Swiss-Prot record:
Gene (name only): HI4'OMT
GO BP term (any one): methylation
Binding-site positions, S-adenosyl-L-methionine: 206-209, 230-231, 250-251, 264
Job of this protein: 2-hydroxyisoflavanone 4'-O-methyltransferase involved in the biosynthesis of the phytoalexin medicarpin. Has also an in vitro (+)-6a-hydroxymaackiain-3-0-methyltransferase activity, converting the pterocarpan 6a-hydroxymaackiain into pisatin. No activity with di- or trihydroxylated isoflavones, including daidzein and genistein, or with (-)-medicarpin and maackiain. The dual activity for either 3- or 4'-O-methylation depends upon substrate availability.
Keyword annotations from UniProtKB, A to Z: Methyltransferase, S-adenosyl-L-methionine, Transferase
Family statement drawn from the similarity comment of this UniProt entry: Belongs to the class I-like SAM-binding methyltransferase superfamily. Cation-independent O-methyltransferase family. COMT subfamily.
One annotated GO molecular function: isoflavone 4'-O-methyltransferase activity
PANTHER family noted in UniProt: O-METHYLTRANSFERASE
Transmembrane segments: none
Alphabetical list of PROSITE patterns matching this protein: SAM_OMT_II
The name this protein goes by in its record: Isoflavone 4'-O-methyltransferase
Organism the protein comes from: Medicago truncatula
Length: 364
């Protein structure tokens, strides 16, 4: 194919090439971030208490001298991507030369170990080989007439079976840590949306894992009788207190009764048919409360008309993650509305929260 020498067409071609190459090599930025997390760069700078020069950072990380220039090139990309910032500092005493030092930015502060907002386990889980290797089977998956996830097509087992085949596995622990770290971020949401839980006497957190979210709610509303409802192998060894109870069961069969049902990061794991069953069981769980009961959903509500292209891209990325791992989905407002009304609810309210998620209140 011959391309015109017209300047406009050449410019378009070059921009198209840049666009394609950028998306092809996006994985490099992800893996560089994972490397920074594994090395503990954010921890080193945080513990140092001030920006660190390249030599200080390499020394703190106990890197071989031959890796200092490699570290510089990783930091150059990560700084360009907004994870670190560069500043100029004076050299050591007696040295008049100035040096570049690296400091933390808001995104890299999310990698500081031990902080409630630490999301290192999210990075670790999302970029785990089990999450990445399956994509090599995508052509086979498209060409097979089987109702299975891409993960199943690649590994021969569902993600849940892979996760639960060994209750002591590091993979299960990593997944639980990732869910717990995301739940800790919920505290910010809770502080801004206390009204959602006011007036309630009881709440059941469906798929609540080890109870991270429920404990945060319980801190602010200690009178609230909370139940964490999850699979028996998840909650079997957990202990609560007078107002915090752990119950094992199957949300597709029934959900414990309460004034409100919380579904945080649950429905996007499932297709519409399965989600409809969960919502109907949730409606039954709050039936004793009449019109005063409600279901509280925290999930993504996709808005493809948003001016924030980065936000929309993240939401669409999540949609493909849910599809390929679970045959689940992220939903648009119209899809949420249909699902909610099909489950027999009378009204709902969607409030954007927490960056890319939404809080959806559903009423009988």
């Amino acid at each position: 194919m011959a391309f015109s020498t017209n300047g406009s067409e050449e410019s378009e071609l070059y921009h198209a090439q840049i666009h394609l190459y950028k998306h092809v090599y996006n994985f490099v930025s992800s893996m560089a971030l994972k490397s920074a997390m594994e090395l503990g760069i954010a921890d080193a700078i945080h513990n140092h208490g001030k920006p660190m020069t390249l030599s200080e950072l390499a020394s703190s990380l106990k890197l071989h001298p031959s890796k200092v220039n490699i570290l510089h090139r990783f930091l150059r990309l990560l700084t360009h991507n907004g994870f670190f910032a560069k500043t100029i500092v004076k050299g050591k005493e007696g040295d008049e030369e100035e040096e570049i030092a690296y400091s933390l930015t808001p995104p890299s502060k999310l990698l500081i170990s031990g902080k409630p907002t630490c999301l290192s386990s999210i990075v670790k889980g999302a970029l785990h080989p089990s999450s990445l290797d399956m994509w090599s089977s995508s052509k086979k998956w498209f060409n097979e007439d089987k109702e299975q996830t891409l993960f199943e097509c690649a590994t021969g087992e569902s993600f849940w079976d892979f996760l639960n085949k060994d209750s002591e596995s590091s993979t299960l622990s990593m997944f639980q840590d990732a869910m717990a770290s995301d739940s800790r971020m919920f505290k910010l949401v809770l502080q801004e949306n206390k009204r959602v839980f006011e007036g309630l006497e009881s709440l059941v957190d469906v798929g609540g894992g080890t109870g991270g979210v429920t404990k945060l709610i319980h801190e602010i509303f200690p009178h609230l009788k909370c139940t964490v409802f999850d699979q028996p192998q998840v909650v079997g060894n957990l202990t609560g207190n007078e107002n915090l109870n752990f119950v094992g069961g199957d949300m597709f069969k029934s959900i414990p009764s309460a004034d409100a049902v919380l579904l945080k990061w649950v429905l996007h794991d499932w297709n519409d048919e399965q989600s409809l069953k969960i919502l109907k069981n949730s409606k039954e769980a709050i039936s004793h409360k009449g019109k005063d009961g409600k279901v509280i959903i925290i999930d993504i509500s996709i808005d493809e008309t948003s001016d924030d292209r980065g936000l929309t891209e993240l939401q669409l990325d999540y949609d493909l993650v849910m599809l390929t791992m679970f045959l689940g989905k992220e939903r648009t407002k119209q899809e949420w509305e249909k699902l909610i009304y099909d489950a027999g609810f009378s009204s709902y309210k969607i409030t954007p929260i927490s960056g890319f998620k939404s809080l959806i209140e559903v009423y009988p």
